Design a protein with these regions (language model features):
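Alpha-helical transmembrane segments and their helix-start/interface "positive-inside/aromatic belt" motifs
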Residues: 4-21, 62
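Membrane-water interface of transmembrane alpha-helices
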Residues: 32, 70-90, 152-167
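Juxtamembrane boundary at the C-terminal end of a transmembrane helix
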Residues: 219-233
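Membrane-proximal soluble regions of multi-pass membrane proteins
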Residues: 157-205
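Active-site and channel-lining beta-strand-loop segments
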Residues: 28-60, 188-190, 196-200
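Select subsegments of transmembrane alpha-helices in polytopic membrane proteins
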Residues: 11-18, 73-77, 102-115, 205-213
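Membrane-helix interface motif
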Residues: 29-44, 118-128, 226-230
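Alpha-helical transmembrane segments
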Residues: 17-20, 52-75, 136-151
Length: 233
């Protein structure tokens, strides 16, 4: 038995993500000494600063922390998606292929936003150095481009996942009519009752872990980043 093998695109994307994070961290550490000891963090309507914070490694490396949070969180989701154990005779099973496609999509989304944070690192250094508000029009264009690319990845994944064939209905495997729960089924992804899309098998603990991790992204992640920003005010 083995887990789902990641696609070539997934493996390449993971390497690129690691390289982007290392380059971002190196750039910020090289520029650290040249930054003002008081970093402008709040600006007036005319673009001049009226609020500062002390320069610290944690503040300067904030884009890298965001990159790491994205990489570790989305990477964790990808690993959970690939955790479906299967035999050597099942590599083409529909749910195995669906897991590989979903993990690829998650990894590509991580790459998009990790790369965006690399530009954010450069924009922050520029803002701190010039002491003028704003990240420039390029920031907005790249942010919009990231959103468009994320949507394109999601659409691509949707077509790759396809429409699974519905399974024979077994009443004890379905809770509240739509929630699939079958601990004896090794699949993480299973067809919905009508076969129109995929759903999770909540009989597997990894499904609960997957939902918990996704919730943590939206709750814990922003809290930690906000704490770093407000530290020392």
């Amino acid at each position: 038995m083995r887990g789902v093998r990641p696609t070539l695109v997934t493996r390449v994307a993971v390497r690129v993500i690691a390289a982007v994070i290392l380059v971002s961290a190196g750039f910020l550490m090289v520029r650290y000494a040249s930054l003002p000891w008081l970093l402008p963090v709040h600006f007036q309507a005319n673009g001049f600063p009226n609020g500062w914070q002390y320069r610290t490694p944690a503040r300067v490396l904030l884009p890298v922390f965001v990159q790491l949070a994205l990489a570790l969180t989305l990477g964790g989701i990808g690993m959970l998606l690939l955790s479906r154990m299967h035999g050597a005779d099942e590599p083409e099973a529909p749910d195995v292929k669906a897991a590989a496609a979903a993990a690829e999509a998650v990894t590509l989304m991580a790459l998009i936003w990790v790369a965006f944070q690399a530009y954010a690192a450069w924009a922050l250094v520029s803002m701190w150095t010039t002491e003028r508000a704003g990240f420039g029009l390029s920031y907005s264009y790249l942010e919009l481009s990231g959103a468009v690319l994320t949507g394109a990845v999601a659409v691509r994944a949707h077509f790759r996942l396809g429409h699974p064939a519905p399974r024979p209905f077994v009443a004890e495997h379905w809770r509240y009519g739509q929630l699939y729960k079958n601990a004896s089924d090794p699949a993480l992804f299973v067809p919905t009752r009508d076969g129109r899309r995929w759903t999770l098998n909540f009989g597997r603990p990894v499904a609960a872990a997957l939902l918990g991790l996704i919730l943590a992204v939206g709750i814990v992640g922003p809290t930690i980043i906000l704490a770093i920003l407000l530290r020392g005010r």
